[in-house]
């Protein structure tokens, strides 16, 4: 009852940019960590919880990137870099995928179970896109197929996926989180 939860609203909170991939874990996570650090400084200085009631602990983190096509040496295009590798095991008779092993360096895994789910989802999306999905459109870019005929994998058709989350400190921000968004679509 002492905590007020507000939904995201740019009328009352600053715009933190797009929520894409794992960007918010990094950007918002680091801003939150910095604000918590300020609170902890007050606690170490002897302030009680009652003394801190009503005090605002605010921090920002801006991950600077260069504009696309910037004429600068060593342009920065992403806030975080990860690493992933996959092994695809095929049935030698049918050519079908039996299993995919996908290992991803995510820095510090803030939510390991979510990381596994993100890897599995990215693998399914990638093999569907690579092997059988079609999204036909007409000359006006209007879809001409029904959802059920797009070639999406059904649950019973998905091969075994062994998602390996490599959890180790990454960047010196956001408690070491790197990200797990886009890189899962590599296979």
Regions found by a protein language model. Give the residues of each.
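C-terminal catalytic domains of large/alpha subunits in multi-subunit enzymes
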Residues: 1-187
């Amino acid at each position: 009852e002492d905590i007020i939860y507000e939904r995201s609203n740019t009328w009352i909170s600053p715009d933190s940019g797009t929520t894409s991939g794992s960007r918010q874990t990094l950007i918002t996570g680091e801003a939150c960590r910095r604000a918590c650090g300020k609170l902890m400084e007050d606690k170490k200085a002897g302030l009680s919880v009652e003394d801190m009631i009503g005090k605002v602990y605010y921090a920002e983190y801006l991950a600077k990137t260069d504009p696309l096509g910037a004429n600068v040496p060593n342009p920065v295009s992403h806030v975080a870099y990860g690493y992933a590798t996959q092994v695809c095991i095929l049935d030698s008779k049918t050519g079908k995928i039996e299993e995919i092993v996908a290992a991803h360096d995510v820095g510090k895994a803030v939510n390991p179970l979510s990381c596994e789910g993100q890897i599995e989802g990215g693998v399914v999306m990638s093999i569907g896109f690579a092997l059988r999905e079609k999204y036909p459109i007409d000359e006006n870019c209007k879809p001409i197929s029904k959802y059920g005929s797009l070639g999406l994998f059904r649950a019973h058709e998905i091969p075994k996926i062994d998602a390996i989350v490599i959890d180790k400190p990454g960047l010196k921000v956001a408690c070491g989180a790197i990200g797990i968004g886009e890189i899962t679509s590599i296979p």
